[in-house]
Amino acid sequence: MTVAYIAIGSNLASPLEQVNAALKALGDIPESHILTVSSFYRTPPLGPQDQPDYLNAAVALETSLAPEELLNHTQRIELQQGRVRKAERWGPRTLDLDIMLFGNEVINTERLTVPHYDMKNRGFMLWPLFEIAPELVFPDGEMLRQILHTRAFDKLNKW
């Protein structure tokens, strides 16, 4: 079994309901179970500011699935909850599920990049992750605690 860390975000169609439904769906993924869930945080949008704030959280999910199998499930959950993928980056969305980490693996395929390509620059991903895995060490040996200390990300407000 591998522990995958998944970032959850929503800023459309009742974000609290979206995230709670996503958590139920993540818990229903075969050969997987949720270990822990962070608090829910309210964060400003990345990119265009003419959209609602996001609800962000992190989940530790233990799974025996392969990384791309897990990705298939997370993308199916997004679609079931009304996610429409548009050319516009950082636009509003009903649900965003990003596989931030998959054990200690480094994955770089056409469909999946793990660790998440920009997570070390995103406080809205790192603070919830720190809440559930404060001693986490990235595959490159960098400690999550040290990243948060040296980059001085603003603390997040709870939802």
Swiss-Prot record:
Pathway: Cofactor biosynthesis; tetrahydrofolate biosynthesis; 2-amino-4-hydroxy-6-hydroxymethyl-7,8-dihydropteridine diphosphate from 7,8-dihydroneopterin triphosphate: step 4/4. GO terms for molecular function: 2-amino-4-hydroxy-6-hydroxymethyldihydropteridine diphosphokinase activity; ATP binding; kinase activity; magnesium ion binding. GO terms for biological process: folic acid biosynthetic process; tetrahydrofolate biosynthetic process. CDD domains: HPPK. InterPro entries: Hppk, Hppk_sf. It comes from the Bacteria. SUPFAM superfamilies: 6-hydroxymethyl-7,8-dihydropterin pyrophosphokinase, HPPK (SSF55083). Thermostable. Retains 75% of its activity after heating 30 minutes at 96 degrees Celsius. Its EC number is 2.7.6.3. It catalyses: 6-hydroxymethyl-7,8-dihydropterin + ATP = (7,8-dihydropterin-6-yl)methyl diphosphate + AMP + H(+). Pfam families: HPPK. It is an enzyme of class 2 (transferase). Keywords: ATP-binding, Folate biosynthesis, Kinase, Nucleotide-binding, Transferase. Catalyzes the transfer of pyrophosphate from adenosine triphosphate (ATP) to 6-hydroxymethyl-7,8-dihydropterin, an enzymatic step in folate biosynthesis pathway. Monomer. Belongs to the HPPK family. This is 2-amino-4-hydroxy-6-hydroxymethyldihydropteridine pyrophosphokinase. It comes from Escherichia coli (strain K12).
